[in-house]
Amino acid sequence: MEVARSLPYTSGSLLSAARAALENGVAVSPSSGFHHAGYDRALGFCTFNGLMVTALALRAEHPKLRVGILDYDYHYGDGTDDILRRLELNWVTHCTAGQTYLYPDQATAFLDAIPAHVARMAGCDVVLYQAGADPHIDDPLGGFLTTAELAERDRRVFQHLHDHGIPVAWNLAGGYQQPLSKVVAIHRNTYRACKTIYDVPMTRVAP
């Protein structure tokens, strides 16, 4: 029961952010723990797949809407792929960097690939961006980007989404460094990048 009660504050928060992004162009949900949860299972700190809950709820509200999921957590979004495969959803464009980019010598290739990843979302009406902190090179469960490279990742994502005119709702995703202030600093850099590109007050949503 306690787990069920958390749903409005996690998946519901991302859905609210996505609705706000459709209206305002950009919004943030301070939530994490989504992309490993699959069609019929919880996994890897993820109880519900809020990315897919949000996508399906938006599609129910707007039957022709197309959703992009840009997953830049360090780990592969296996739960998201599981749901997409089982439901055979062809209106969701899913890009998960955790399938390909894992090592420090891939940092430049990853950053250079961001424009192409965003371009894949060009037909989408909204993008859900998982801005993971666990790709940081010092993260115990991740590690291939420096702090500066993570900041550049976010700048490029927001710049290219803005240039394409695609609304974006972003969330925090993984981050496991201790003390927690190290993870918070990475999330603050994501916020700064978004604020700089969009030059608008951020919409912080409640469930």
Protein language model regions, located:
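A general "terminal functional-core" signal
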Residues: 1-207
